[in-house]
Amino acid sequence: MMINEQIRAREVRLVGANGDQLGIKSRNDALDLAANLNLDLVLVAPNAKPPVCRIMDYGKFRFEQQKKEKEQRKNQKVISMKEVRLSPTIDEHDFNTKLRNAIKFLEKGDKVKASIRFKGRAITHKEIGQRVLDRFSEACAEVSTIESKPKMEGRSMFLVLAPKNDK
């Protein structure tokens, strides 16, 4: 952002410190006006014809901008991906344990990647793995939405579940 002497335009549309329009002035007049008020002349819209400048305390403005950015970064939620590994021949109790963990992750706001690794000749029966993943996604349906359908990648099949937004 250009301030004071960095502004090269001959004429500028001037906006006062309290937001009122002061009209089109020469750059030097605008600089003098800002200097008399002990404030800075800041170029806010360089592409306008003529460019728009505002009289303000630039140090205070920068401080406010940094404060806003810091607040936005603080309010950003980092969504992490948790993985739950299943097998095509998973027993009922193991399935329920994995399901409880996945639901806990989803309620916390994390995404869940449910994956099945096919070992040996089990890869010839992909439909069994497909059924396990379908059952898993149906069991998590109350707290999640399917972000990506089950798909094969090498010897693994996986699907991604995202938490539901109940806002």
UniProtKB/Swiss-Prot annotation:
Major location category of this protein: cytoplasm
GO molecular function, a single term: translation initiation factor activity
Key word Glycosyltransferase present: no
Top-rank taxon, per record: Bacteria
Cellular component per GO, a single term: membrane
Keyword NADP belongs to the record: no
GO biological process: ribosome disassembly
Keywords: Cytoplasm, Initiation factor, Protein biosynthesis
Record's subcellular location: Cytoplasm
Pfam families given in the database record: IF3_C, IF3_N
Family according to the record: Belongs to the IF-3 family.
Subunit structure as annotated in this protein's UniProt entry: Monomer.
Function: IF-3 binds to the 30S ribosomal subunit and shifts the equilibrium between 70S ribosomes and their 50S and 30S subunits in favor of the free subunits, thus enhancing the availability of 30S subunits on which protein synthesis initiation begins.
Name this protein carries in UniProt: Translation initiation factor IF-3
Lineage: Bacteria, Bacillati, Bacillota, Bacilli, Bacillales
